[in-house]
């Protein structure tokens, strides 16, 4: 294999591209492009001029972690011991209705903050699911002082919201 110079290689690429009518690839952008991009796209201070490209500072808001994922049986027992009201969502990652109702659960966790909301993946923690006879996903169990009060089987938002509202502590 012979070694050729870079200019010779570029010449051969160009001649191949022109002979087969293929578009010539842009091999190396001008450094001026990077300089102008650095001035406009990465400028964190707000722009005061009325130019075509404007910059904007971004702030992110911390996400509320109001629904907690439990990964073992001990976490489940601790949650029941440490909170007066606990709503448990038994779900599976492959379950479509579980994914569909998850945003509603997060919304209700903000509206009814005195209930502790937890999720238990039945594939990761099967012993807890078996202990409470979970046969379908999603299954929601409401606990008060560590004792099961009620349950809702299936993604039924009106029934679940009624359960939460009826058992929500006032303080």
UniProtKB/Swiss-Prot annotation:
Gene Ontology molecular function, alphabetical: protein-disulfide reductase activity
Chief location: cytoplasm
Similarity-based family: Belongs to the thioredoxin family.
Function: Thioredoxin involved in responses to oxidative and cell wall stresses. Plays an important role in appressorium formation on hyphal tips. TRX2 may affect invasive growth via the MST11-MST7-PMK1 pathway since it is required for the proper folding or dimerization of MAPKK MST7.
Disulfide bridge positions per record: 95-98
Protein name: Thioredoxin-2
Induction line: Expression is induced in the absence of TRX1.
Natural source organism: Pyricularia oryzae (strain 70-15 / ATCC MYA-4617 / FGSC 8958)
């Amino acid at each position: 294999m012979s070694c050729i110079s870079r200019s010779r290689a570029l010449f051969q690429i160009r001649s191949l591209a022109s002979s087969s009518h293929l578009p010539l690839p842009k091999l190396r952008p001008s450094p001026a492009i990077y300089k102008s991009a650095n001035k406009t796209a990465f400028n964190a201070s707000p722009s005061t001029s009325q130019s075509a490209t404007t910059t904007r500072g971004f702030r992110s808001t911390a996400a509320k972690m109001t629904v907690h994922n439990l990964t073992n049986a001990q976490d489940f027992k601790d949650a029941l011991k440490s909170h007066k009201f606990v709503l448990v969502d038994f779900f599976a990652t492959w379950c479509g209705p579980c994914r569909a109702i998850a945003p509603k659960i997060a919304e209700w966790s903000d509206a009814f903050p005195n209930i502790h909301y937890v999720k238990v993946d039945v594939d990761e923690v099967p012993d807890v699911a078996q202990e409470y006879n979970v046969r379908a996903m999603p299954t929601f169990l409401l606990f008060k002082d560590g004792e099961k009060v009620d349950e809702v089987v299936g993604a039924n938002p009106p029934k679940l919201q009624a359960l939460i509202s009826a058992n929500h502590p006032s303080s």
